[in-house]
Amino acid sequence: MLIKLLTKVFGSRNDRTLRRMRKVVDVINRMEPEFEKLSDDELKGKTAEFRARLEKGESLENLLPEAFATVREASKRVFAMRHFDVQLLGGMVLNERCIAEMRTGEGKTLTATLPAYLNALTGRGVHVVTVNDYLAQRDAENNRPLFEFLGLSVGINLPGMPAPVKRQAYAADITYGTNNEYGFDYLRDNMAFSPEERVQRKLHYALVDEVDSILIDEARTPLIISGPAEDSSELYIKVNKLIPKLIRQEKEDSETFQGEGHFSVDEKSRQVNLTERGLVLIEQLLSEASLMEEGESLYSPTNIMLMHHVTAALRAHALFTRDVDYIVKDGEVIIVDEHTGRTMQGRRWSDGLHQAVEAKEGVEIQNENQTLASITFQNYFRLYEKLAGMTGTADTEAFEFSSIYKLDTIVVPTNRPMIRNDLPDLVYMTEAEKIEAIIEDIRERTGKGQPVLVGTISIEKSELVSRELTNAGIEHNVLNAKFHAMEADIIAQAGQASAVTIATNMAGRGTDIVLGGSWQAEIAKLTEPTEAQIEEIKAAWQERHDRVLAAGGLHIIGTERHESRRIDNQLRGRSGRQGDAGSSRFYLSMEDSLMRIFASDRVTSMMRKLGMKPGEAIEHPWVTKAIANAQRKVESRNFDIRKQLLEYDDVANDQRRAIYAQRNDLLDVSDVSETIGSIREDVFKATIDAYIPPQSLEEMWDVEGLQQRLVTDFDLELPIKEWLDKEPELHEETLRERILEQAVEVYKRKEEIVGIEMMRNFEKGIMLQTLDMLWKEHLAAMDYLRQGIHLRGYAQKDPKQEYKRESFAMFASMLESLKYEVISTLSKVQVRLPEEVEALEQQRRAEAERLAKQQQLSHEVEKGALMSTTEAQIASGARKVGRNDPCPCGSGKKYKHCHGRLQ
């Protein structure tokens, strides 16, 4: 009550921010007549003037009014488009490290030109981030004439571009690209073997379009570059054949419930659980299929891999549905993005799930992958010095933007008042009744010339509505992942009178639906249109536009509520752009997944008690409240998951930053001999201390063991026993120094043979190679630790603290191994002629280039990860030989010192 009163008196924080910014808008408006008088050359000269003032120490904030006035005037001359006052407000919000919520149709793309220009003046680069390649290319090409008029360069960063082209794109003042591509380039740069292979500059300012989609919907989606593991496709096929024999039961067994089935599904957490009966049956089936010894338990350590396959196959059959979660096209399983309804070509689920779905669908099974490098979007975008974003719907997620990214959300007012009529939800008992009511509404709306957009949450639902409309004789277009290529054309005509368009979720996001259709699309179809033709098309469009407005504008129909209110608001936001008329209504049924999983049973029983007749809908505050509560519950749960993921990933992130900083330092220096000398001392001291403990009696020394170790690990044959026999006064300190001197001397002789420059290059190459190999192994170990750490909770320990403690110990151990492996490899290397060394180096580079070309990018969704497949490293499966295990060849040596050693 008190907060409401204070807000009434002083205004909300949003109001106060906008009030402050409006004063700056007034300043910019007062400058307009002055800037209109400037010639084109004088206007272009402003960029050089601003840069000179920045160099003298003036701040961007001081330059902002003039810079914005410059962009506005340039836009009027280049595009014949003038930035509205609200777009200037949006530009200021974006410059202040905030999220700007701007409604659909308010011109976010044009708004972005303001802060992009201002921040590009620093010469440190601006990254404009979009959700797909089409939008990146479209926005870059659309805005290029404006930026180039003002003397700024524009780059486009797209998948598959060669490194020199990417480097050029990143060197531009303003670079357009997708979130995935920026992230993958960052990871690839940190796997480079020379400074020339890197493409990115230091991350300065990121301007994220559709920021909610990237920083929230995809926050649980790590970007991963991975290499193939061993082939286990045969096992997936065998396990897949057994799953249909298992019967699903309604819920999990408990003290009060004992089912007759073999597994239960928890739809909330998207997990599958075997029952006791199910475990007995699957063990029996696995034994019969000769996949497991009779009498063995599926949960025994030797069957961990088998358990993994059974779980993946069960999830594939019980949780993942064709045409909802994925489609099968050209013998390939392609994931469908649950947030946009778009297909995600090349992306793959991890943890063997994708292979299990491929086995289920009977298509070719591709190899599993092992992580070589990974980062989440949360941590990638927090690397930028300055981050801002814009979207049509951010206010519902303002708390998350603030708590995770430290970004405030400012709601920018619309240029014209919003007059869309959002009608109350209608709730039906069954889905069939709901579909019937939707068709009736469509028939009524199109009868009076109103265009209709029907939003569905999956391809399956969009095809169901499409079939029913076809049966009812209503013409319509379907926009879903299967017809992705036609997206722009369908969206362009979705505003025509009586047009009916069915779209999955937010397909076509980023493209406005213009009432009366798109006149630009009509002109684009003509080759070299004349002025007269253009005027004729515009006049015909204006007539259609007015007719559609008179009919009520675009009507939105939601076929069910999404888990997030934000996605519902995005669907509604397609209508009522720029003050146009429009309306929206959601049709729900008690069979909808949100209602079934999250809304209470009380609502269903209440509706039954009301004695609803078939086809009758209910509009009741209780039902609306129950739906809102269900959505809030899901949003809160999803936020907790993202927050927890971030807390765990922050541990890995600190280590990642340390390793990548070390790696970049290595790349940038030409001489690492000092570092090698320093770690050689550490390694030899630790090795000698293990056999000759400091300040110990000679009787405690294991001289033979030390001699053997020096030969095995450092290829260093020293007569230590003879030295001690001949020189009784030789104590441990002088012995330690002599061993180190001998090691350095042997190394120097090798250096003389191959030459100093060649040796420096070789040292650097070995350090990078060893670092990459150990980091890859460390990532796999961290992954295993993360998967089982929650079990520590049963021992009354905090899993997060345990994870931090153990991962730090693992990291420290990895750094020690790095020192040891580098010195061991350099000591054991066989000296060859300089020409041979050069040939080997060229061979290694050629191999690295070949592997880089083979990279394909993919993306894990929900639980998994975004993977980029490369054959860079061969990863092992369940029974991998550990580096400290005995070598399988039977030599008796450790694997790392025998067939597993670095060549």
From Swiss-Prot:
InterPro entries: Helicase_ATP-bd, Helicase_C-like, P-loop_NTPase, SEC_C_motif, SecA, SecA_CS, SecA_DEAD, SecA_motor_DEAD. It comes from Photorhabdus laumondii subsp. laumondii (strain DSM 15139 / CIP 105565 / TT01). HAMAP family: SecA (MF_01382). The lineage of its organism: Bacteria, Pseudomonadati, Pseudomonadota, Gammaproteobacteria, Enterobacterales. This is Protein translocase subunit SecA. Keywords: ATP-binding, Cell inner membrane, Cell membrane, Cytoplasm, Membrane, Metal-binding, Nucleotide-binding, Protein transport, Translocase, Translocation, Transport, Zinc. Its cofactor is Zn(2+). It is an enzyme of class 7 (translocase). GO terms for cellular component: cell envelope Sec protein transport complex; cytosol; plasma membrane. Induction: Repressed under conditions of excess protein secretion capacity and derepressed when protein secretion becomes limiting. This is regulated by SecM. Zn(2+) binds at residues 887, 889, 898-899. It is a peripheral membrane protein. GO terms for biological process: intracellular protein transmembrane transport; protein import; protein targeting; protein transport by the Sec complex.
